[in-house]
From Swiss-Prot:
Residues 3-147 form the Globin domain. It comes from Pan paniscus. The modification S-nitrosocysteine is found at C94. It comes from the Eukaryota. This is Hemoglobin subunit gamma-1. PROSITE patterns: GLOBIN (PS01033). The modification N6-acetyllysine is found at K60, K83. Heterotetramer of two alpha chains and two gamma chains in fetal hemoglobin (Hb F). The ratio of gamma-G to gamma-A chains in is approximately 2:1 in infant chimpanzee, and 1:2 in the adult.
């Protein structure tokens, strides 16, 4: 799963306190759908996903992106039990939605990119390392039902 040092936890929590969940969530999910278009098949009910501008302006993409990052915020409070924290979401995405678990890894990487854009110089290599460790652990926790 990945062991988080106290420094990792402090770094993740500190930056998370400055994240605008609505903006970053919409941008993260939107970028995932644009950069990895095959992920769009899980979002048929979202309406127009025909172009980058349609995706980035789609209110359903923004709303679901906010929901995803809100869930991530809950996980940040439970870094030592990500598998337990995401047990129900893992089951939902595996058994009911049949989401390819690789998509969780891709979404995490896109989130790291979005945070780097939003926080610029504040998003140091050390901050990136802690966040990368976290999104990798979250992807693993969300994929746990698949194994």
């Amino acid at each position: 799963m990945g062991h988080f040092t106290e420094e990792d936890k402090a770094t993740i929590t500190s930056l998370w306190g400055k994240v605008n969940v609505e903006d970053a969530g919409g941008e993260t999910l939107g970028r995932l759908l644009v950069v990895y278009p095959w992920t769009q098949r899980f979002f048929d009910s979202f309406g127009n996903l025909s172009s980058a501008s349609a995706i980035m302006g789609n209110p359903k993409v923004k709303a679901h992106g906010k929901k995803v990052l809100t869930s991530l915020g809950d996980a940040i409070k439970h870094l030592d039990d990500l598998k337990g924290t995401f047990a129900q979401l893992s089951e939902l995405h595996c058994d009911k939605l049949h989401v390819d678990p690789e998509n969780f890894r891709l979404l995490g990487n896109v989130l790291v990119t979005v945070l780097a854009i939003h926080f610029g110089k504040e998003f140091t290599p050390e901050v990136q390392a802690s966040w990368q460790k976290m999104v990798t652990a979250v992807a693993s926790a969300l994929s746990s039902r698949y194994h």
